[in-house]
Amino acid sequence: ALSSAASDVYKRQSLQMSGIMQLERFNLQIFSGEIMGLMALNAHGVSSLVSLLQSNTPVHFGRVYYCEQLVNSHIYSRTTPNEIVVIGQKSHLVNGLTVGDNVFVLSGVERRWLLHTQSFRGRLQELEQAVGVDIPCNRQVEELSLFERCMVELLKAWESGARLVLLWNISHFLAGTDIGRLHYAIRHFASRGMAFIYISNSYEELCGLCDRIAVMYNGSVIKVQEMVSGGSEDIHALLQQFTGTTSSPPRSAMSRGSICLNLSSVSTALLKQVDLAVYSGECLAIHTEDRRLLDGMRRLATGQSALLGGKVLIDGQPIHRPMARDQRVAYIAENPSQMMLFQDMSYLRNLTFCLPRQIDSWFRRRSIYRSLRRELTPELGAVFDKDIRDLNTQEKYALIFRRVLLQQPRVVFFEQPFWGNDVLLQQHIERQVQLLLAKKIAVVVLIVGIYDAFPLAERTLIYKNGHLLTQ
């Protein structure tokens, strides 16, 4: 029997796409007014679940109920989409229209030929006052910040009568203060009966917001944890069980080396008077509430921005050329498994891409290839003859980090290391970074989401409006 308060029920779901089982025996029940956290240990089945929620993708087995109505099963599938809203990095608002048009007209609330914008303004102000925001009704959608856009989508979902809202990795692109304001709005609408599924790979974030947390692995829910006393410890124990890792000792207790990178009053098109000192073997995280500083650091490290003022010193020696051309500096891009590998090159050519030019000799290159195979096969396995396209994500990350190790830099810039990655991949990335730190290579992590704070970081510098706020 289903509870009368049930908003969504997924019973023993099995969903297969392109011959691969995406959801298998998936069981989940969400109640009206509940904030359900969803943490995926790996990414398998998450996108398929979102598609199932919205568009009733045909299933091989099981039943889906929405507002106590059967909407999908292996026998029957409703052709119309469910009134379920997904809020993520991709905008679902219509550019060229105002906030009021999106919230009241496109949501289907107003069906009259003549629309009274004054009434829109009053109703929007009531909603905004309840959740603590102030967005003008006549403001164009393309002028909204990321936080304002998320809030408008949430207000639109409420006005359209949606009973369930899915928020997908919100903390990856919203600043820390904005996350707190969004959580306040979520709690407000939950108190009025709206249900939420909050997808995040940070258990700290989920524990601070959700009533329950569902842990998903390989397309199945393996645990649903009530957020009562002891809940957080149970989640930690489960993570250790699946990852086979224990908590790392605090990096702050480890000895520091000498300063290997020093930015002294550095100015570029996006950076203004930035001072920064990074020690040999140190992991330093730089957190900013907007992407301007992050973009400026990336453009500086990759040589896309010229130095307009100040000095960049490595091991006390100033560099007079772009950092990207200096062998002592390496850069790992956001989503490197897609951005930093050459699909048409062999594994070994990708691996040795950053080595000096003296391996251009065919005989020299073949000797290096044999040596690398012999040294790395026990650690990496039989990956050297694989096509790059056939590598899994963890193998691609291992390839990228071994390439960096072969380059032997003094400092590595790593942008958004956890962006969009599942829990198991995050653990793998941490192990790869530890390889760099063990070689006394400094790692500078650039992050936007406050819950992406890197566990290995000895220090975290928090910037606001381009200025250092705290350390």
Predicted regions and their residues:
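The feature captures the beta-strand-to-loop junction immediately N-terminal to the Walker
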Residues: 39-42, 287-291
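Single conserved hydrophobic/aromatic residue that forms the stacking wall/gate
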Residues: 1-10
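Conserved beta-strand
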Residues: 11-15, 21-31, 62, 261-282, ...
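H-loop/switch region of ABC-family ATPase nucleotide-binding domains
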Residues: 200-201, 446-448
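Q-loop/switch helix immediately C-terminal to the Walker
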Residues: 90, 95-109, 335, 343-361
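Conserved ABC transporter NBD signature motif
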Residues: 61-71, 80-82, 309-327
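A short, surface-exposed alpha-helical micro-motif characterized by mixed small hydrophobic
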Residues: 206-208, 453-455
